[in-house]
From Swiss-Prot:
CDD domains: GATase1_IGP_Synthase. This is Imidazole glycerol phosphate synthase subunit HisH. Pfam families: GATase. The lineage of its organism: Bacteria, Pseudomonadati, Pseudomonadota, Gammaproteobacteria, Lysobacterales. It is found in: Cytoplasm.
Amino acid sequence: MTDVALIDAGGANLGSVRYALERLGVEARVVRDAAGLQGAQRVILPGVGAAPEVMSRLRAQGLVAPLRELQVPLIGICLGMQLLFEHSEEGDVECLGLLPGIVRHMTPALGIRVPHMGWNRLVPMRESALLAGLPERASAYFVHGYAAPVTADTVAACDHGGLFTAIVQNGLRCGAQFHPERSADTGARILHNFLEMSFP
């Protein structure tokens, strides 16, 4: 069985992510320090809340450098995905810098509410095993007020007043802006793909 490390960065969605993994037959280990990453074959960084507070917690746990040096597949979920980028406008905070790009505040407009909350369609941008088995026009559940730009690493985007990155992958580093644990079959499939796919 795959050894999965689930990082406890203080997010309220930790339990629901763990339960989503259990439904896939995976018993994840909850990790709160660098030692807990040893032996992991997959690492999951969930997150809700504010980027400065979660980055501060990761620093206090001694996890920033180990995450930057990680040599096994990593997926960030929601805020966890945003933290994979270089910087966030939320609190003007330096993030992990594993992916190029700056996370910016979403701009409200007529008919466009911020935070972005609810179901929205995924727009595939390039091929990736993360999308294997997803139906056309698959939708996922989003709750966020900041978003990462579309880059060459974007696997799928979403449109809410403009396109932003919904799924990202660069080598071993992956991310989902939406909540897979709240996205029914779509979320379960993406978690399954992350756990089972081959990485370069």
